[in-house]
């Protein structure tokens, strides 16, 4: 299975500043010219919400302050400017080799 290592495990960012979350895959998640890396946001008591798919494409209704980048094994999620509503857990997920759809360990994002 592809292992995803996410960092940092927790992050505190001031309102209006930039939050950057990284995800490294144990092998490339690229295929057919597409990076099969996705990002999810999860708030307590709610199902995960798809933010970014195929490394850099925004999910439906996702604000422009969320962006993704990367290819191969190294990816990042950027949130800028940080808003109060962005406090949540964030997870990367690979969808190149399925099943299983493996996830990173998660990043807890809070307001500083």
From Swiss-Prot:
Region (Framework-1): 1-23
GO cellular component: immunoglobulin complex
Segments for region (Framework-2): 39-53
Annotated spans, Framework-3: 61-92
Chain segments carrying region Framework-4: 103-112
GO terms, biological process: adaptive immune response; immune response
Region (Complementarity-determining-1): 24-38
Region span, Complementarity-determining-3: 93-102
Organism superkingdom: Eukaryota
Annotated region described as Complementarity-determining-2, given as residue ranges: 54-60
Disulfide bonds: 23-92
A Pfam family matched in the record: V-set
Name under which the protein is recorded: Ig kappa chain V-III region PC 7132
Organism: Mus musculus
